[in-house]
Amino acid sequence: MPGITRWPAVLKNEASPIPLRPALILSRAPQNRFYHDRSELHDLHIVRNHGVKFGNVISGRLSDSNYCRYASTNSKPTSPESPDPIAEKKTTKKQPQQQWRVQKDALKKKFAEGWAPPKRLSPDAIEGVRELHRQNPQKFSTPVLAEHFKVSPEAIRRILKSKWRPSEKEMEKRKIRWEKRKDRIWDHMSELGLRPRRETPDSPLETKTIDKLPGNQGKPF
């Protein structure tokens, strides 16, 4: 077939350790068509700065203008000294988890929805728990403190483990929050009829009238 040159079965070059498979290098001459055999022609890779350099066959000469080579896309250069990542992954042993990681996974499994205790201790009660445990850890252990304060042992454990201490500004904010919480609980219990209604500035009980007192009907107290 005119215009077609068949290269040897195995073609090597010192610049590239990859052997080139049999392929058909075609001419770009106008009179030639790109006839090729799919069983022999492989993917075309342009090599500009490295690798084997082959030019197009033009009038029986090699042109240096364009460089190309035919090689399989699956043939990748692998160094014989490079380790196999799959073999290393199989040989590496699984290291044991640290104690804090084991405990964290156990708590996450136990409290799937997060830590949300039904009962919360006030800041004064928390300081009392720490002080009692500091004075006599054997007598005031975690189960004893949990039974005394009517909370779970996990809550006592978290209180004793925590090293965070609030500043003076934070203590003032916490005091205000707990005052509001106390009023909210009192209002809820008063709605249930367990406690009398709390007297607030907006409550009608605060603006008492002394209708019951003689001589001062209709006047505020």
UniProtKB/Swiss-Prot annotation:
Comp. bias (Basic and acidic residues): 191-201
| A GO cellular component entry from the record | nucleus
Q: Which InterPro entries does the record associate with it? A: NGRN/Rrg9
Protein location: Mitochondrion
- Region of interest called Disordered, as start-end residue ranges on this chain: 71-100, 191-221
List, as start-end ranges, the regions of compositional bias called Polar residues: 71-81
What keywords tag this UniProt record? Answer: Mitochondrion, Transit peptide
Sequence similarity: Belongs to the RRG9 family.
What does the function comment of this entry state? Required for respiratory activity and maintenance and expression of the mitochondrial genome.
Q: What is this protein called?
A: Required for respiratory growth protein 9, mitochondrial
Gene name in the database record: RRG9
